[in-house]
Amino acid sequence: MQPVKTKKKLSRADKKQIEAAIARANRTDKKGKSAQDSIPYERMWPDGICRISDSHYTKTIQFQDINYQLSQNEDKTAIFEGWCDFLNYFDSSIHFQLSFLNLAASEETFANSISIPPQRDAFDSIREEYTTMLQNQLARGNNGLIKTKYLTFGIDADSIKAAKPRLERIETDILNNFKRLGVAARTLDGKERLFQLHAVFHMDEQLPFQFEWDWLAPSGLSTKDFIAPSSFEFRTGKQFRMGKKYGAVSFLQILAPELNDRLLADFLDMESSLIVSMHIQSVDQVKAIKTVKRKITDLDRSKIEEQKKAVRAGYDMDIIPSDLATYGSEAKKLLQDLQSRNERMFLLTFLVLNTADNPRQLGNNIFQAGSIAQKYNCQLTRLDFQQEEGLMSCLPLGLNQIEIQRGLTTSSTAIFVPFTTQELFQNGKEALYYGINALSNNLIMVDRKLLKNPNGLILGTPGSGKSFSAKREIANCFLLTSDDVIICDPEAEYAPLVERLHGQVIKISPTSTNYINPMDLNLDYSDDESPLSLKSDFILSLCELIVGGKEGLQPVQKTIIDRCVRLVYNEYLNDPKPENMPILEDLYNLLREQEEKEAQYIATALEIYVTGSLNVFNHQSNVDIDNRIVCYDIKELGKQLKKIGMLVVQDQVWNRVTINRAAHKSTRYYIDEMHLLLKEEQTAAYTVEIWKRFRKWGGIPTGITQNVKDLLSSREVENIFENSDFVYMLNQAGGDRQILAKQLGISTHQLSYVTHSGEGEGLLFYGSTILPFVDHFPKNTELYRIM
């Protein structure tokens, strides 16, 4: 064990905490018994090993949820079989306990995660409105409960020295078993285990847990003094008091001939504070088989006795009590399972701890839990004069003081599948709101930057809420983060929101006086190539759109354009002043000066965009493209110019991303009607390039489209799907549903969430997590009106 380093000096705050702990530690009842005396462990070490008794040592692993209830049947079967294998890992020398803690959190716990702090600017009223919306959504769900799951395992050993290596070996095996199931898990250290015990003992008051290992030596206190409640009261046989909370522990009597995998999930869906504890002890296989064989022998003996009686009484010897026949066949089936079907025997103690603020509420909570048990032909029975032992057995310590055990095989034990539905509620500073989990009613708050690939897609039929979802994310991102936002808006939908956020709407049309120069060059334009090479590549794409036709540019034409591009930037590169930036006309004039007839052909094709009626892109830039939120409105560009407009916007985005990269700032780029970009080979290739390279540059692109078929008809587009770890899928048309199911591996059950779904309802793909969501944004808000 590593010795704990002690501080030389304690701060004044530390001393205050220790004095408070000493005051609590000195509280005793008339018999001189303190609350600490009831807590059944001897010592907790900083690495998380706990000595429960002279020779029993335990460790605790916290594990996360996976989507079991949402999975299709074959996936459910795979999870169930994986869980059976997991249980079979435990031999009779390892006692283990599954603990499910649903504890009420203080309002501040969640309020801090969802509030958007005011910044004393023109947007504080919107921030306040958004925070209120989140608080209302939070109140609707059961996010008032913090739900955690633990596996505590323990072994007998003569000393901590002997226990430690063995516990570490078992810990590694358990973590690997969880990994095989796709479940995230981690081992708790000593302070984290104490924190969890403190949370159970202090349900009545949201006291912060304050403890440091180096407080123990100077104070003479034990770890129990920092976690014990103000008092325990076990006076009545059927319930107890812990501080100001009332509680009662019941055990589950399993009477049903067949168990259902929803039983545990239904307990955990209750909206009151609750702890479910399952103590499981594997029975030695040889002993289990011997016991069953002995039972079969006893049953056979009873059967013979009954047959003798029948012969003596003169009736048919085949008529024996039906119970005997049933028990006999069941015992033989059990023996067969143990001998040839990879089943083991387990002894299970299933405890449920309900708590409440008063006895009446406690009665209601227990009645609700009892109703769930009855629904599955089981019975929840209150422990009689064993409430103290029951409470201590519900702590994630790995100690079972209740000797009420039910023998079950592996598959019967595994039916209590500890997985229900995944949650996506991240506490990070930049976690944004994406709706409510349709399965659990909990808020979905995630930060796309934490994904391996933050690129995203928003997909849905017209009217399903695509643009609204994008606008909601833009508003949330603007109010909460310092990211820049760029929008390519082919339908002129985003202006009200952008203007309210004091952004810049750049309206590009043949009649507009807003100009963007496609020849603008940023000297930081590329990371590993010269800025000019990448700019040349862009201008080649632009010329290909203008000149190319079906065959695209010929090699000679490409060479001429590349030569002219390098010449046209000479003056600017020698003296990089804004007025030296070339425009399209400079390139046109250079092409006219070239000798090759191909150069004249390209120049003639460019003429309409330079001196003709489509010369909107032949001007120096005159708009503020440095605003934090920029929207390129290209609705009125017309068919001829729209493709070019989209390509120019993409080039502007690259410029912005490279500037922001140097400033360590993220850039979010939203492309509405994205399928339009993918119809042309040049814009499609450029878009795929963005999806491949943006992440390295701190860019987060989001494509918004209704035409999944168009999206997938492009040869390049599969790269976009492969490089998008975030997909926000709203209602889908029949044909599109099948394409997406194949592309993203969606089950039939999951597809039901995007089949004839309402506005703002669908499926969220976040990395490997799939969740159904609902987002009904309040309509009586300023934000709703501008979105």
Where are these regions (language model features)?
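Conserved P-loop NTPase
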Residues: 744-787
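A short helix-turn-beta junction within AAA+ P-loop NTPase domains corresponding to the substrate/partner-engaging
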Residues: 502-506, 716-729
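P-loop NTPase motor domains
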Residues: 66, 73-92, 99, 103, ...
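Conserved lysine of the Walker
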Residues: 466
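Extended, folded cores of ATP/NTP-driven motor/assembly subunits in large transport
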Residues: 1-421
